[in-house]
């Protein structure tokens, strides 16, 4: 978030792409959630509750479905759609069948952010336009984002 704070302070206009936590912060920023609010949300005890829900609940229920994260993002962002954002945004996730990075440029913002934040072994993958998506992948094991060309 520090980079976004400096760019905003200097009046530099940006397009945003991200993977995993970068998609969570970048998507909220592109939806014009203030950086101060994003920071407050990450430090808020309710968000900590959501983050704790990410942990798998072996053996009773298996891996986290990510539904708590999805509910949280929906409450924060409403029905925002990527293609309608005033700040260009793309989330990046990995197709688990092919290992190829998939750039999410349109559709529900909360769903794209949730897909990009689907840490393997922690979250269930997300279905998106015929792909089964997780964060990272063989080409980007840390969830790092390939450079994405945005307008």
Label each PLM-derived region with a short phrase:
Residues 1-19, 27-151:
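Patatin-like phospholipase
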């Amino acid at each position: 978030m520090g980079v976004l704070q400096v760019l905003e302070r200097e009046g530099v206009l940006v397009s945003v792409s991200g993977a995993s936590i970068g998609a969570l912060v970048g998507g909220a920023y592109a939806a014009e959630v203030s950086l101060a609010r994003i920071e407050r949300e990450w430090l808020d005890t309710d968000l900590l509750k959501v983050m704790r829900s990410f942990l798998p609940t072996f053996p009773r229920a298996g891996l986290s479905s990510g539904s708590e994260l999805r509910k949280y993002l929906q409450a924060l962002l409403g029905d925002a759609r990527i293609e309608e954002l005033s700040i260009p945004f793309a989330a990046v996730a990995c197709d688990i069948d092919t290992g190829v990075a998939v750039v999410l440029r349109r559709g529900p913002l909360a769903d794209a952010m949730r897909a990009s934040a689907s840490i393997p072994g922690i979250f269930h993958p997300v279905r998106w336009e015929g792909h089964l998506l997780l964060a990272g992948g063989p080409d980007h094991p840390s969830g790092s984002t390939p450079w994405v060309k945005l307008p």
